Swiss-Prot record:
Origin superkingdom: Bacteria
Positions of short motif LPXTG sorting signal: 1117-1121
GO BP terms: cell adhesion; symbiont-mediated suppression of host complement activation by recruitment of complement control protein
Propeptide regions on this chain: 1121-1154
InterPro entries on file: Adhesin_Fg-bd_dom_2, Adhesion_dom_sf, Fibrogen-bd_dom1, Ig-like_fold, LPXTG_anchor, SDr-like, Sdr_B, SDR_Ig
Chain intervals with Acidic residues compositional bias: 908-918, 935-1093
Record region (Disordered): 54-230, 904-1129
Protein's recorded name: Serine-aspartate repeat-containing protein E
This protein's encoding gene: sdrE
Stated family: Belongs to the serine-aspartate repeat-containing protein (SDr) family.
Positions of modified residues (Pentaglycyl murein peptidoglycan amidated threonine): T1120
UniProt-annotated location(s): Secreted, Cell wall
Amino acid sequence: MINRDNKKAITKKGMISNRLNKFSIRKYTVGTASILVGTTLIFGLGNQEAKAAENTSTENAKQDDATTSDNKEVVSETENNSTTENNSTNPIKKETNTDSQPEAKKESTSSSTQKQQNNVTATTETKPQNIEKENVKPSTDKTATEDTSVILEEKKAPNNTNNDVTTKPSTSEPSTSEIQTKPTTPQESTNIENSQPQPTPSKVDNQVTDATNPKEPVNVSKEELKNNPEKLKELVRNDSNTDHSTKPVATAPTSVAPKRVNAKMRFAVAQPAAVASNNVNDLIKVTKQTIKVGDGKDNVAAAHDGKDIEYDTEFTIDNKVKKGDTMTINYDKNVIPSDLTDKNDPIDITDPSGEVIAKGTFDKATKQITYTFTDYVDKYEDIKSRLTLYSYIDKKTVPNETSLNLTFATAGKETSQNVTVDYQDPMVHGDSNIQSIFTKLDEDKQTIEQQIYVNPLKKSATNTKVDIAGSQVDDYGNIKLGNGSTIIDQNTEIKVYKVNSDQQLPQSNRIYDFSQYEDVTSQFDNKKSFSNNVATLDFGDINSAYIIKVVSKYTPTSDGELDIAQGTSMRTTDKYGYYNYAGYSNFIVTSNDTGGGDGTVKPEEKLYKIGDYVWEDVDKDGVQGTDSKEKPMANVLVTLTYPDGTTKSVRTDANGHYEFGGLKDGETYTVKFETPTGYLPTKVNGTTDGEKDSNGSSVTVKINGKDDMSLDTGFYKEPKYNLGDYVWEDTNKDGIQDANEPGIKDVKVTLKDSTGKVIGTTTTDASGKYKFTDLDNGNYTVEFETPAGYTPTVKNTTADDKDSNGLTTTGVIKDADNMTLDSGFYKTPKYSLGDYVWYDSNKDGKQDSTEKGIKDVTVTLQNEKGEVIGTTKTDENGKYRFDNLDSGKYKVIFEKPAGLTQTVTNTTEDDKDADGGEVDVTITDHDDFTLDNGYFEEDTSDSDSDSDSDSDSDSDSDSDSDSDSDSDSDSDSDSDSDSDSDSDSDSDSDSDSDSDSDSDSDSDSDSDSDSDSDSDSDSDSDSDSDSDSDSDSDSDSDSDSDSDSDSDSDSDSDSDSDSDSDSDSDSDSDSDSDSDSDSDSDSDSDSDSDSDSDAGKHTPVKPMSTTKDHHNKAKALPETGSENNGSNNATLFGGLFAALGSLLLFGRRKKQNK
């Protein structure tokens, strides 16, 4: 149904909410009998869920002051804002929101709220009381002033004890209870344009009539509204501007408006956007989120009273979003959108004209809505949206009273609110205590489930009976016929479960798993009776709690409304035999009350459009069509701002056209044109012809009963300018461009904007020219990069177009090119440095004419950064040089030659002194050949000289003499053998070590001489003489063995060292002399003589061996004495010489063998 009064449009009246119908539960509903065309708005306490209101009444047939402490004070609530007679003959009428003209007798419009009430009475009275009319205030006052959505409010009935309780016998006549009603916020209606159509009756039973002219009906049937959505939209638009404070509201047929139970949703859309693919939560910007419980005063969620949790969120949709993309809305895990049904389909997001922006689906497991964007986001930009969601405490996750922190989220951005969950208490009167709620509505099967707690306080109750009535019950437990009913008969499903003494019932009054309780249904087969739409169960005397689950049928009204009510009561007897009653009534109503009088549809409100054209104004005159080159401009963003501040944007088409429709008469709108890049707005109001001029970048227009297609604007291309000029070689270095000075090519030039951002880079051409093009007015910075081998010349020496502006300069463009930004460079001269390294023999640090250069000294050149840029060596004259150097700072490093010492530095003029091992030098436009250094030899030496001389002389002299003489003589024989062996060995080892060292530091000289002489002389002489002679024989044997060994070892080691630092000289000399002398002499003489012989022997042996330095030998002096040997027997001499020869030969062989 259409309830334009409750829609929030994107106008000054607020934002349109695409509402779903709701169910609500309450005890009483009152209203006028005026029937208006349209769909009954089904109110409720949850999104898509009928929520039962529990109104409990108790009565006692007997006065008993002693039981007053068990009684509870009852305050009944009503939801009407109009005053009507409350009696059973006045059925609840459909709320019909029509646009009708007021009549003289017209009652003010009221909108009945639907909520589940727990209005309970527990009284017994001695006399009946008159039924008072409900005090109802019109609910349209708020609607007229604020044009807000109707919000469902529910209030839990207080469970206070009623101290004014009287009793009467159970046989007395019941009295009527006094009912006080309380206004509540009206319920919002559903935007029919985004609803799914419902089946319609076969006949047209609703017409829209004009209250001021009832004879002229407007022939708008439900079928027409269903089949002609445009007609319905027109009704909506027509209705949206109606003053509902004085006029009835037009509604659409039920067949077009889907019923939603407890579906308190409001959607409001401000601006369209663009889409991507898949989830685009990151492209959704949440601007505001709030959570409110009920009226927001105490944050107490009275769950049995249907107090809702309202979640409001506002967000914008990025222009990158595309059709098919999705976003998410998350409910808290402890709430549920629908309290009675499984229909959780979320409402579509629409714009003020009813066009769908996104469609939603609900995931019950995750309690998340996923919205999928339509092509709306491809057509529009800068979309802003608002969403209001109503939910209710999920009794499955929150079975008992508690405190919660509820968290909701839009596109993953969360907000939280602390709430207290409050459940109803049982109604108690004497031993009677009972409570009930509706728990499930099945619209397809047309059934309603009710759960009843019997004796939840586990009192000892006597003669207990429980009635289940297909209608409400009054304060005395009597059946009260009237609006709303169910069917209670033998086909009604009634289950009874016993609660064990150790089991606690959840305070939520809702059981999800009955298997935990004892099923005692069969025990009531003979204790259950049906009569007049009432079932009675006889419990007898009990002290346990029981649960009754009732599933009853209901009959929908002809227009599909849910007019459902069902009551239950418990009665017990006290010790006096009087009955105590306690009762609850649960019901669902499906109407909004309005004031009396017939109404007709107000004439359709006409909607208008604005727009037109964006063009390129080539001649900048602000008038269309004055230049043949003018053309339309496509893709220009145009934004419409509604009176309430919301916006909607489109882009011009290929013909430069744009248009906004669905605008209301008398309202003021603003149209803004975004200036395209590279363009400027043209002249405004260049002519008096409003359809040919330009209205500028922003224009405000008021709709005056007609379309306005004259809102045009023009743009012209922003002029572009050039900047640049010249880079030249300033050969004379005067900073002025001369005619004969050439340009420098390939010089890099960088252009920056006023923020320092680089916007261009180029290089000069062959003639030194450069240029930056397509520049806007503004300040720019130009930077020239110094070419290799050049130096910047002086700057700003003359006129701006002929001088050099330096390496960095600022250029200003103001409606003209700027070609004056030049820079000059001259070739950077190259320089040399170096000089001389010499041997400073006199150590005075000055170069003398007699002192010579040192060759091959390594010289290293470093730049200012310490980087090695050159290495060379001095030539044969000690000269070195580095060339091709720029002006700058350098360091020269001399590598000290081995064995030399650094001479003193800086002793005289710079070109003749020594500058040291490291010299810092600065070249400024000239060579520098003053960088010298000198070295000398130091006197002291650090020398280690080791001379090791080893002389070994081994002499072996062996003399073996064997003399055998055999003489046989009859004579007398005298034989004399004399052998003399003399071995003389002289070994002389001479070692000479000479070390000459000159050093600046220590000198260590070590000389080690080892001389070893080994002489072995062996002389063996064997002489055997056997003489037998008769005669006299004289035998003389002379043996001389001379062994002369001369060993001369001469070692000379000379070490001469001169070093600046540490010198080590080691001389090792080894001389080995081995001399072996062996003399073997064998003499055999055999003599036989008969004569007398006289033999005399004299053998002198004087060998001498002398070894002298340098091998000087002395001759042996001659032996003095007689040498007359003439008388020696010749034979003896022969034998002696033979023996000597043998000895010498034997000795030579022996020596050779060694």
